[in-house]
Amino acid sequence: MYKNIIFDFGGVVVNFNPRDFLMDHFMNRRAEEETYDIVFGSQEWQDLDRGIITREEANKIMLEKAAHANRVFEVQTCLDEWFTMLETNKTTVQIMRKLKAAGYRLYYLTNIPTDVMDELRQREWFSLFDGGICLLYT
């Protein structure tokens, strides 16, 4: 019988859908695609996920790319507001509460960067976890 359940954050406990975020903000397919490529689809975003670059370094490079593509406004908007797309997945949290009440121990395993992890620790559901591992902590 299982006693421990492991959850990821992005796309499980919190929603992460950059394309919807871009559509809600810009409603222009070309702007959305170019901005996606510069931010969420970039090597810098992957490097940030791997913990080999800081948010400041990644942002600087992305803004330089944005300047060349004439997308500074869009990219800066993403860099300033992307956290807002990390809405709590209420269904997952309900399941977590039921599992906890049934005696299961809950853990997280994630690669979310430090600044995001710090913000998630403030959410009311974070205390449901008995522990966890953040694979990077830059």
Predicted regions and their residues:
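Active-site neighborhood of HAD-like aspartate-dependent phosphohydrolases
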Residues: 1-41
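Generic structural signal for small/hydrophobic residues in well-ordered secondary structure
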Residues: 8-11, 51, 108, 132
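Helical cap/lid subdomains and adjacent loops of hydrolase enzymes that gate the active-site channel
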Residues: 31-48, 78-90
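A metal-dependent, Asp-based hydrolase signature
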Residues: 46-78
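Short, acidic loop-to-helix structural element flanking the phosphoryl-transfer center
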Residues: 73-107
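Short, conserved loop/helix-junction motifs that constitute active-site signature segments
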Residues: 100-101, 124-128
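Distinct, well-ordered alpha-helical segments
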Residues: 117-123
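Conserved small/polar residues in nucleotide/adenosyl-binding loops
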Residues: 137-138
